[in-house]
Amino acid sequence: MIGSNESSTEGPIPTSYLSFLAYLLGEWTGVEHTEDYLSYGAYLSWVLFPLAIVFILPVAIFFFCFNTSLLLLHIYKRRKNGFNEGHSGDVWYGAKEMLVNLWDGHGRVWHGYELHGDENIPEVPALIVFYHGASPVDYLYFMARLLIRRKRYCHVVADHFVFRLPGLKMFIEVLGVMHGPKEVCVSALKKGYLLAISPGGVREALFSDETYAIMWGNRKGFAQVAIDAKVPIIPMFTQNVREGIRTLGGIKIFRKLYERIRLPIVPMYGWFPVKFRTFIGEPIPYDPNITAEELTAKTKAALQALITKHQKIPGNILRALMERFQTRQKED
């Protein structure tokens, strides 16, 4: 039994939750001033909680949609005979309908997504050339909105590393993602496909920044594809795409690492709910007398004109967030 002297030295047990927890820890560990440590921990939690909301929640929502897409595709694959295959006989027709509605909903809620100028996309085959943000999520929104609004399906050319990512085979197949040899692209266009490509690719995605610099280098293969397939080129740009997700590509070591191993190992941050508007420019018609170099320069100028017209440079995350509260532009 505890004696009266021992009881008097310990004093009363504290009544507040934090003080009581500190008291228990102090008695158990023998460490003094545990209440100060707990108070500091509570303060840190209070400070870091908004940061966790800003950085973790958007990523969690995105990956929830992505994993939901994969789950729906696996369910569809098992039960696809019970879904509508559509008039085209496409066995993935029902899956496409599910995915485009999921991603269009994500775009509407998270970015207030708008698509402008889709009347510039002809009913004939065409090659869409777009600026590549840090993430291709704006292309997903565009593809979904175009299919919902125009019933027009757009295929896209992706870097070879995408096809090596585990678990994406079905997702890639349903979204019409293609590996990009010139012959494959020309064949797809001659079959009547609408095809999208970003000449800047992964390098532009990782190492362009809020100045929206187009980083094509000497790439002109896309122009030769359009010439060989005898199709128009259509420029496309998404406003604020760099403010949605930022990269640390300005750090030289990441650029050197990419050039050595050609894998996109560059940290990203953000997933901010900024305003996204995709703008489709006027078509550059097929010209049998133009060279690939001339068509490349012409396309780059058209894309730069879209950026200059619709993007305030340098991009600003706060301004892009505030644009969510501006009057919604009427979609074409």
Curated annotation (Swiss-Prot):
Which reaction is this enzyme known to catalyze? a 1,2-diacylglycerol + a 1,2-diacyl-sn-glycero-3-phosphocholine = a triacylglycerol + a 1-acyl-sn-glycero-3-phosphocholine; a 1-O-alkyl-2-acyl-sn-glycero-3-phosphocholine + a 1,2-diacylglycerol = a 1-O-alkyl-sn-glycero-3-phosphocholine + a triacylglycerol; a 2-acylglycerol + an acyl-CoA = a 1,2-diacylglycerol + CoA; an acyl-CoA + a 1,2-diacyl-sn-glycerol = a triacyl-sn-glycerol + CoA
Q: What does this protein do?
A: Catalytic subunit of the alternative triglyceride biosynthesis pathway, which mediates formation of triacylglycerol from diacylglycerol and membrane phospholipids. Synthesizes triacylglycerol at the expense of membrane phospholipids, such as phosphatidylcholine (PC) and its ether-linked form (ePC), thereby altering the composition of membranes. The alternative triglyceride biosynthesis pathway is probably required to provide the energy required for rapid growth when fuel sources are limiting. It maintains mitochondrial function during periods of extracellular lipid starvation.
Show the GO cellular component annotation of the record: endoplasmic reticulum membrane; membrane
GO BP, sorted A to Z: triglyceride biosynthetic process
Q: Residues on the Cytoplasmic side? A: 32-45
Recorded source organism is Gallus gallus (Chicken)
Q: Quote the EC number.
A: 2.3.1.-, 2.3.1.20, 2.3.1.22
Instruction: Please report the record's description of how this protein sits within the membrane.
Output: Multi-pass membrane protein
Domain of life the protein comes from: Eukaryota
Task: Please list the residues that make up the active site.
Answer: 132
Q: Does the keyword Membrane apply?
A: yes
Family classification: Belongs to the diacylglycerol acyltransferase family. Highly divergent.
Primary location group: endoplasmic reticulum
- Topology feature Lumenal, residues: 1-10, 67-332
Keyword entries, A-Z:
Acyltransferase, Endoplasmic reticulum, Glycoprotein, Lipid metabolism, Membrane, Transferase, Transmembrane, Transmembrane helix
Localization of this protein: Endoplasmic reticulum membrane
Supply the name of the protein: DGAT1/2-independent enzyme synthesizing storage lipids
SMART domains linked: PlsC
Q: Which GO terms describe its molecular function?
A: phospholipid:diacylglycerol acyltransferase activity
